[in-house]
Swiss-Prot record:
The protein's annotated pathway: Cofactor metabolism; retinol metabolism
Annotated site, Transition state stabilizer, chain positions: N170
UniProt GO MF annotations: 3-chloroallyl aldehyde dehydrogenase activity; 3-deoxyglucosone dehydrogenase activity; acetaldehyde dehydrogenase (NAD+) activity; aldehyde dehydrogenase (NAD+) activity; aminobutyraldehyde dehydrogenase (NAD+) activity; benzaldehyde dehydrogenase (NAD+) activity; identical protein binding; NAD binding
UniProt keyword annotation of Cytoplasm present: yes
One Gene Ontology biological process: fructosamine catabolic process
Protein name as it appears in the record: Aldehyde dehydrogenase 1A1
Gene symbol of the encoding locus: Aldh1a1
Length: 501
């Protein structure tokens, strides 16, 4: 059976006007307590799009207070039927579909995303994920347990409470939905901090949340910086859980703050240096295409990027040649322009970090096959770059680059490549390309990664749990397991006069 047809991609919205730039608390728009604002840039032009209210600890305190009030026993949210929560989430998904063109245009302008990708993948994936979570709202069940003695025992899955949610800049809207969807489905309230680089789609979503009919205080959105607003959420004594997607370095700080405060629950989806293993029997054209997509999609700004390509010795040269040909086909430019394959990196800091790592690859002896520098005179663009003859000890083989840079390494045996693939502090994703079923199962079982793709790469769906091993994070998002991350499991044991089977 063929996949459902994708919707036609319209032209981006012309003359975009940003309507929402304030802090959203209790279904109302607020200025920051400090009176500060911060600029939001278009990374393709380096121009300021608008200025947004800069939330900090005082604003987070207000948002948490509103979220706590909305979570009180007897509140409209706590007494709402679970099926009604699902209806509200479906209504929100419908409003996203209505505003799909607007949201995709904002993602492209604010986040540097190729517009077609934003419209099809980011919006399509966000809407599907929200509808998936909506369907779970009245299907989160406890159990009855046949315990010993004259005792009737059952379990309840209850919402945790006030959840702080810190969103990354690489997939601002998709990660916003991955966070709020499960949390709201289970009956929690949330305080969301979008990334300071990309707050605009989250703030538009705030207007849709109010329009959909969510009670005041259920969703609160505080734009601001990590060291101020993010730290305030992580260390807040009245936040019951924090979820974060971003770098491992910041994830460590969040987990430390959670432990030092009230030992709040923590879900972390962090960095990666994901291996992609291509055996000689693989369909090489398919492997080249998926490996290319796996590292160059969204300018390489993906936590699951296939940033270590291991290719069996006998097909190595052909794989490199085909990969270079594929990378050279890329067209760079303004992501709103039709026919563009690659937009800019998110900001100057990321842009300069990528160029520094590329220089390290040159100095350490990797062979630069194509790219290797800045592109254009304006915007944070990096040329699609391919390195061959990469060895495991090079910086480009060990550090997360988060840019359009492909490292291709050679291997001789299955035992060798498994050992090398696992020789990293990360464990988020991996890919295996082979026609041998036994080999595919053996290697996928041996790889230390939260998701392993076989003969494909970067295939994500709302039905499947996603998360990392080792320093790539804790917990899971999406799927049934992702829902349960937003519940506490309570056992209730009742003394009765007589128990009967």
């Amino acid at each position: 059976m063929s996949s459902p047809a994708q919707p036609a991609v319209p032209a981006p919205l012309a003359n975009l006007k940003i309507q929402h730039t304030k802090i959203f608390i209790n279904n109302e728009w607020h200025d920051s307590v400090s009176g500060k604002k911060f600029p939001v840039l278009n990374p393709a032009t380096e121009e300021v799009i608008c200025h947004v209210e800069e939330g900090d600890k005082a604003d987070v305190d207000k948002a948490v207070k509103a979220a706590r009030q909305a979570f009180q026993i007897g509140s409209p949210w706590r007494t709402m039927d679970a099926s009604e929560r699902g209806r509200l989430l479906n209504k929100l998904a419908d409003l996203m579909e209505r505003d799909r063109l607007l949201l995709a245009t904002i993602e492209a302008i604010n986040g540097g995303k190729v517009f077609a990708n934003a419209y099809l993948s980011d919006l399509g994936g966000s809407i599907k994920a929200l509808k998936y979570c909506a369907g779970w709202a009245d299907k989160i069940h406890g159990q009855t347990i046949p315990s010993d003695g004259d005792i009737f025992t059952f379990t309840r899955r209850e919402p945790i409470g006030v959840c702080g949610q810190i969103i990354p800049w690489n997939f601002p809207l998709l990660m916003f939905i991955w966070k709020i969807g499960p949390a709201l489905s289970c009956g929690n309230t949330v305080v969301v901090k979008p990334a300071e680089q990309t707050p605009l789609t989250a703030l538009h979503m705030a207007s849709l949340i109010k329009e959909a009919g969510f009670p005041p205080g259920v969703v609160n959105i505080v734009p601001g910086y990590g060291p101020t607003a993010g730290a305030a959420i992580s260390s807040h004594m009245d936040v019951d859980k924090v979820a974060f997607t971003g770098s491992t370095q910041v994830g460590k700080l969040i987990k430390e703050a959670a432990g030092k405060s009230n030992l709040k629950r923590v879900t972390l989806e962090l960095g990666g240096k994901s291996p992609c293993i291509v055996f000689a029997d693989a369909d090489l054209d398919i492997a080249v295409e998926f490996a290319h997509h796996g590292v160059f999609y969204h300018q390489g700004q993906c936590c699951v990027a296939a940033s270590r390509i291991f290719v069996e010795e006998s097909v190595y040269d052909e794989f490199v040649r085909k990969s270079v040909e594929r990378a050279k086909k890329y067209v760079l430019g303004n992501p709103l322009t039709q026919g563009i394959n690659q937009g800019p990196q998110i900001d100057k800091e990321q842009h300069d970090k990528i160029l520094d790592l590329i220089e390290s690859g040159k100095k350490e002896g990797a062979k630069l096959e194509c790219g290797g520098g800045r592109w254009g005179n304006k915007g944070f663009f990096v040329q699609p770059t391919v390195f061959s003859n990469v060895t495991d000890e090079m910086r480009i083989a060990k550090e997360e680059i988060f840019g359009p840079v492909q490292q291709i390494m050679k291997f001789k045996s299955i035992d060798d490549v498994i050992k090398r693939a696992n020789n990293t502090t990360y464990g988020l994703a991996a890919g295996v390309f082979t026609k041998d079923l036994d080999r595919a199962i053996t290697v996928s079982s041996a790889l230390q990664a939260g998701v392993v793709w076989v003969n494909c790469y970067m295939i994500l769906s709302a039905q499947c749990p996603f998360g990392g091993f080792k320093m790539s994070g804790n917990g899971r998002e999406l799927g049934e397991h992702g829902l349960y991350e937003y519940t506490e499991l309570k056992t209730v044991a009742m003394k009765i006069s007589q128990k009967n089977s």
